Design a protein with these regions (language model features):
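Conserved SAM-binding loop of SAM-dependent methyltransferases across substrates and taxa
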Residues: 42-55
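Non-catalytic substrate-recognition/targeting regions of SAM-dependent transferases
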Residues: 1-16, 24
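S-adenosyl-L-methionine
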Residues: 63-108
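Mobile active-site "lid"/loop adjacent to the S-adenosyl-L-methionine
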Residues: 66, 87, 107-138
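C-terminal catalytic and target-recognition region of SAM-dependent MTase-like enzymes
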Residues: 134, 148-196
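Conserved class I S-adenosyl-L-methionine
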Residues: 32-41
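Helix-to-beta-strand junctions that scaffold the AdoMet/dcAdoMet cofactor pocket
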Residues: 79, 143-144
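Conserved SAM-binding motif I beta-strand of class I
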Residues: 56-61
Length: 196
C-alpha cells in the first residue's frame, strides 16, 4: 500500500506507524468482506482492506480534511469499486445504525476512537474510558454472523470493562499488534478482537 504523508505543516503525518500490524491483519482478512472503518483518520486501514480484496469499505470520519486525504490514498493505490467515504460524527452514526430496524452488516470493523473529544462538530463530549462500553456495543450490533471487530485505543490508563461487555467474546491481542520498532513502549496502544 502507498500513502500520502505530510512532513511539513501538520503535527501528525497522516499515518499511525504503530498500527502497521493491525492494518496488515485487516488486509489479510479482508477478501470478499464488508469493511467498516470508524474514526478513520486518513483511511489507511480502509486502503489495506481494499487492497486485500474487500467487497466494500465504508470509511467514516468527522473531518473533511482527513476524508480528502483518504480519497487521495485510495487514488494513489488505484482503488476503484464499492469504497465509500462518509463525513459523520461516528458516535451519532453508530448509535443511529445500531438502533435501526434494518442494520447495515459488516464482516470486519476497525474502531480506533480518540481518547477524548469535545469537538464543536459533536453533540456531546467523548471520553474513551467512560464511553467505550456503549461504543463497542453499538459497533458489535453491526457485525455480520462470524464478523470481527477490532477495537484499539492509545489511552495508556485504559481499562476494558469486560463485565459490562460479557455478552461479547473479547480477546486482548495488544502484544501481537505492537510492531518491533515500538516494542520498548508496550503501552503505545491496546487492541482487542471482539465477536458475538
Amino acid at each position: 500500500c502507498q500513502f500520502g504523508v505530510n512532513f511539513e505543516d501538520y503535527l501528525d503525518t497522516g499515518l499511525f506507524l504503530d498500527h502497521r500490524p493491525i492494518r496488515l491483519m485487516i488486509q489479510q482478512q479482508a477478501k470478499n468482506k464488508r469493511f467498516l472503518n470508524l474514526f478513520a483518520y486518513t483511511g489507511s486501514a480502509s486502503v489495506h482492506a481494499a487492497i486485500g480484496g474487500a467487497r466494500s469499505t465504508l470509511t467514516i470520519d468527522m473531518s473533511n480534511t482527513y476524508l480528502d486525504w483518504a480519497k487521495r490514498n485510495f487514488d494513489l493505490n488505484g482503488i476503484r469499486g464499492d469504497h465509500k467515504l462518509v463525513r459523520a460524527d461516528c458516535l451519532q452514526w453508530l448509535n443511529e445504525q445500531a438502533g435501526a430496524k434494518h442494520k447495515p452488516q459488516f464482516d470486519l470493523i476497525f474502531l480506533d476512537p480518540p481518547t477524548f473529544s469535545n469537538s464543536k462538530k459533536m453533540d456531546e463530549v467523548f471520553d474513551i474510558q467512560k464511553d467505550h462500553v456503549q461504543l463497542i456495543h453499538d459497533a458489535a450490533a453491526l457485525l455480520a454472523p462470524g464478523g470481527k471487530l477490532y477495537f484499539s485505543t492509545n489511552f495508556r490508563r485504559f481499562k476494558m470493562d469486560q463485565g459490562a461487555l460479557k455478552n461479547l467474546l473479547i480477546e486482548d491481542i495488544s502484544k501481537a499488534m505492537i510492531p518491533e520498532d515500538f516494542a520498548r513502549d508496550a503501552k503505545i496502544h491496546y487492541c482487542w478482537k471482539i465477536s458475538r
